Amino acid sequence: MLIDFQNLKIVCISLKSSTERRNNFEQMANRLNFKNWSFYDGIVLSDHIEGCAMSQINVLKENMDDTPVLVVEDDIQETEFYKNTIDLSDVTNMDALYLGYSNWAAHPIRAQMSLLSGPSTFIKIKEYYKIANVTSAHAIIYISKKYKQACADGALKYLTDPTGNRHCDVVYAKLQNEYNVFATPKHFFYQNCPRNKIWTNTPIE
C-alpha cells in the first residue's frame, strides 16, 4: 500500500476558538500540498478530557471503514524527516501507523504514572517499528476498520473506568498490545507546543 499524503484524507481536530493553531495548520497543509484535508470542530465541554475523547471518537465513527485516514491534532508541525509518500507494502495486516509519538512512557515510572502495564516497546520489522504502550494521538494513520472500532469503543469505555485516567491516548497505547500498530523510525510530525514538544520531537532511531 502506497500512502500519498497529498491525496490522503486528513482530519485535523481543532477547537473553533483555536484561531492561531488553525492558521498554523492551514499554512502547513498548503506548504505540504495536502489536497484532501478538513477541520473537525472539537467538542467543547467543561471536562476537557471528555471533550478530547469524544472528538476523537466522533472522527473515527465518521470514518468507520477500511480506508486509511490520517487523524491529527491542531498543534502539529512537520519535521525534516517528513516525505510526501511512504510504502507500507512490506508490512501485512497493519492496523495503524503512528507518524508522531511521545517518549513519555518510555521510562517505567512515567509509564506507571499513565497506568500502563510497562514502558513503551519498539520492535523493528523491516522498515517500521511495531509499538506498544506508546502514548500520544497527534498524528495517526488509522487503516483497518476493526482498529478504528476498537479505539472508538475503548476511548468511550475508558471515560467511565474507575481504574483509569480517562485519557484516550492511554487507551490507544494499551490497544497497541492487541493490534498491529506501527510507527515510522523518524517522526514526520511533533506537537509544537510548550507542554508536549519535549516529549514528541524525538525519533525512534
Model-based region annotation:
Residues M1-V72, I76-E205:
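An acidic/histidine-cluster motif and surrounding catalytic segment
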